[in-house]
Every structure is written in structure tokens, then in C-alpha cells.
Amino acid sequence: MSRMYETIYIVQPDLGDEEIKALSTKVQDVIASMNGDFKRVEDWGTRKLAYPINKNPRGRYFYLRFDGDSGLIAELERRLRLDDKVIRYQSVKLETEVVAPAAAPVKSAEEGTEEVAAEAATEAPAETTTTVEG
């Protein structure tokens, strides 16, 4: 049974473009060879880690979203674990398809200001002042 998964993996920040491309291709080949279907692949770039991992204060993040079965996850995580360039990885099963929220409809300038003023009047907290004598 095919399920939706997300995987984020972090690689060493000092890798060259060729090494990163080769690693990314290898990861995508594992998913494709096990009949996985890519939904999204993103390179989030180099970011500061919350704490140093293997003496690296930074890491380059990659995000994958794909369909596959549990055997695919086991094989993907095995390959990521064996690769010395990968310093961390995490895979999670998504319960449902995640859909980005729709943008709010654009209102005309007159409608928007009237509604904002009405909302501000109803949502404004009551001001209270207390005097402390000492």
C-alpha cells in the first residue's frame, strides 16, 4: 500500500556541488528504483544547526516528499545511515495529503477599511489602569 512520506536529510556543509548532486541523485534513484513517486524535492540550503553534529555547526538541508511503501523507507534510511556525508535524517509518514491554504480573496479598498475598523472595535481589549500607592 502506497503512503505519503516526508524525509529531511542534512549533509556536511563543506561538500562541493558535484558531491551534493551525486548524493541527491543517489537518494532519488533509491526512491525511483522501489517504485516511489516524487511529489516535491527541495534544497533548503545551508543553515545553522541547533547544536554541533560531528563538530559541524552548520549543515545543508534537503527535503523530499514522495509516495511509497514501508520497504522503501527502510532502504532509504539504510542508505542514508551508511553514507558518511549525511549527518542526520528523519522520515515521517503523512496521514493525509497536505494542502497549502488558499490565499484570502482580495477586497476593494473601501470594503477592507470598513471591515478592519469594525473588527478592531469589536476585538479591542478594554484598557484598565491600576494605581499602586506605596
Swiss-Prot record:
Residues 118-134 have a biased composition (Low complexity). One of its GO terms (molecular function) is structural constituent of ribosome. It holds the Pfam family Ribosomal_S6. Residues 103-134 are annotated as: Disordered. The keyword Ribonucleoprotein applies. GO terms for cellular component: cytosolic small ribosomal subunit. Keywords: Ribonucleoprotein, Ribosomal protein, RNA-binding, rRNA-binding. GO terms for biological process: translation. Signal peptide: none annotated. InterPro entries: Ribosomal_bS6, Ribosomal_bS6_sf, Ribosomal_S6_plastid/chlpt, Transl_elong_EF1B/ribsomal_bS6. The keyword Ribosomal protein applies. SUPFAM superfamilies: Ribosomal protein S6. Binds together with bS18 to 16S ribosomal RNA. Belongs to the bacterial ribosomal protein bS6 family. This is Small ribosomal subunit protein bS6. It comes from Citrifermentans bemidjiense (strain ATCC BAA-1014 / DSM 16622 / JCM 12645 / Bem). The gene is rpsF.
